Amino acid sequence: MIYQADTLQVKEIQDGIAELSFCSPKSVNKLDLATLESLDKALDALTSHQGLKGLMLTSDKDAFIVGADITEFLGLFAKTDAELDQWLQFANSIFNKLEDLPVPTISVLKGHTLGGGCECVLATDMRIGDKTTSIGLPETKLGIMPGFGGCVRLPRVIGADSAMEIITQGKACRADEALKIGLLDAVVETDALYESALQTLTSAINEKIDWQARRKQKTSPLTLSKLESMMSFTMAKGLVAQVAGPHYPAPMTAVITIEEGARFARNEALDIERKYFVKLAKSEEAKALVGLFLNDQYIKGIAKKAAKSASKDTERAAVLGAGIMGGGIAYQSALKGVPVLMKDIAQPSLDLGMTEASKLLNKRLAQGRIDGFKMAGILASITPSLHYAGIENSDVIVEAVVENPKVKATVLSEVESHVGEDTVITSNTSTIPINLLAQSLKRPENFCGMHFFNPVHRMPLVEIIRGEKTSDETINRVVAYAAKMGKSPIVVNDCPGFFVNRVLFPYFGGFSMLLRDGADFTKVDKVMERKFGWPMGPAYLLDVVGIDTAHHAQAVMAEGFPERMGKQGRDAIDALFEANKYGQKNGNGFYSYTIDKKGKPKKTFTEDILPVLADVCADKQEFDEQTIIQRMMIPMINEVVLCLQEGIIATPQEADMALVYGLGFPPFRGGVFRYLDSVGIAEFVEMAKQHADLGAMYHVPQMLIDMAAKGESFYGAQQQGSI
């Protein structure tokens, strides 16, 4: 043994050839701080090892290295610029040491080789993988960019254009693609991988492969003419500006880094990479996006605990109510390996549900994500039925009939009589209280809400709603089932609107009040999209949700929270509803809609909306962008905080993920609680006070007032790794 540490070891495997194996005692290998320090010492040991002829990098896991340890990021980013720069110099000195070994080196890859793992293997002379290999640099998705030499080495290995595509998109390449662009030198069968790598390394040792020329290419400036350079980087900047936009600076910063470093040799180019990495790491966007990743891991951890605590797994499910929503739920369940009975009282609805599932599967088939055999198997695992026969075999029932409390209560009571005592029954509802529906059941402890978002196959969030009598066992089983479906389940307590709709309607309330006071709804949409970062402004979102749906939900919320959400007279939503302008569904709402060549609705502003709004809107008034943002966001933020204060949602992490996954809250802002920490709670309280005369929606919850007085934050030292 040449060197041994907790997460890696080095041994000589045959005359002069050493193997450095990453072998973390955990389930995956990560390039955490401890592993980096061990790698540094291992390379020192190799440098002083007599008779060294070549080095292989291997992993004892199904994945080579999944990346750096993201739990350590926020702690690192909290360092001063100088401290972070110094740490990056140390980290890069390790990979330089690997690259500068006086012998040929090869990385033997299988499974994921991502982020820091990819940057590590770029420092070796050769890379060989099997068909399971996936290699790439996802850092820009976290608001940063490669900082271990990825922006320097990758363009020199595969060319600037391919490198910029991978880095700016945060892309991972499959083995065949990586081979095609030169990121891998060979792809072989898994059984032959180790031996093939050994043979390749031996060929390099025997000078049959010019490994020194490869190394020189990586440590020299990029070979681009002035014209090539101008074309590559100008085009890349244009594409990135179009796709990433101004709220996500990491992709553009990566392009600038590669461009500026192109004319320098390795060490000078690494200095440039380090400078820009520090700038990104200190940004609010990086803090928010890394925080979201950690929050997502937190949600997944809760789901894993639920699955372990549940007395049984969901092996079969049933959906009551077909159509597009029921078909979407059935599709998602079957896709993830849980056969489902889809029951409805009308054959046309069953046909629509099966058509929806078939349409979604055909899309996957066209994208090459499944083959015909797999598609047929998934479709066959959805059983449409007009009867309850066979439903007794289901572990979980999802009721998804029309949003009517009497109809739902009847269906729930009926299905309970057809299933066993340990069958869990759930209701997919967005507005009807779970405690009310539970009254129709003999076993309310086996019942909870399971609120899917539309379209089911795209929206990651599922709200799991706990009623007063819902048992922990029921919650655990439903959370585990939602996770099995590939969703992100978040448990909330029952209240009008649950969590997501409850916090959405004060936002719509703020919008209605802006229109009442003379704001132009098209300007409000532009500000909330372009400046704040929502995927849709409030008027456009209302059109997509459906004005009729919003009108009904608004009435439910007004009844549930009359002080904050009760209305004084008619508003814009009422006016459109009364004019039968329901939004996209009937082609007219705030905007008018036509179908484009791709079959998608295209919105345009037409003046026929103005008379409809005339009696609920004041004469046109100009509002600056900050006022629009404040008047739109303060009501939502206050309601989110009240939900935490009242225990409707358990943690800031779950609230922020629900907002991003369920409403499209701008990811670069990290959710309401991350946003509050970024703005400063005391600053937010003062800002809200300036709008207090607008009504109760703008009155700050006591929790925020108390936290502001104590100088507290929601995340604080949380998610900060110990450095």
Swiss-Prot record:
Natural source organism: Vibrio parahaemolyticus serotype O3:K6 (strain RIMD 2210633)
Family per similarity comment: In the N-terminal section; belongs to the enoyl-CoA hydratase/isomerase family. In the C-terminal section; belongs to the 3-hydroxyacyl-CoA dehydrogenase family.
Binding site for substrate: D296, N501, Y661
Pathway connected to this protein: Lipid metabolism; fatty acid beta-oxidation
Annotated positions binding NAD(+): M325, D344, V401, V402, E403, K408, S430, N454
Protein name: Fatty acid oxidation complex subunit alpha
Reactions catalysed, as given in the entry: a (3S)-3-hydroxyacyl-CoA + NAD(+) = a 3-oxoacyl-CoA + NADH + H(+); a (3S)-3-hydroxyacyl-CoA = a (2E)-enoyl-CoA + H2O; a 4-saturated-(3S)-3-hydroxyacyl-CoA = a (3E)-enoyl-CoA + H2O; (3S)-3-hydroxybutanoyl-CoA = (3R)-3-hydroxybutanoyl-CoA
Gene3D superfamilies: 1.10.1040.50, 2-enoyl-CoA Hydratase, Chain A, domain 1 (3.90.226.10), NAD(P)-binding Rossmann-like Domain (3.40.50.720)
Keywords associated with the record: Fatty acid metabolism, Isomerase, Lipid degradation, Lipid metabolism, Lyase, Multifunctional enzyme, NAD, Oxidoreductase
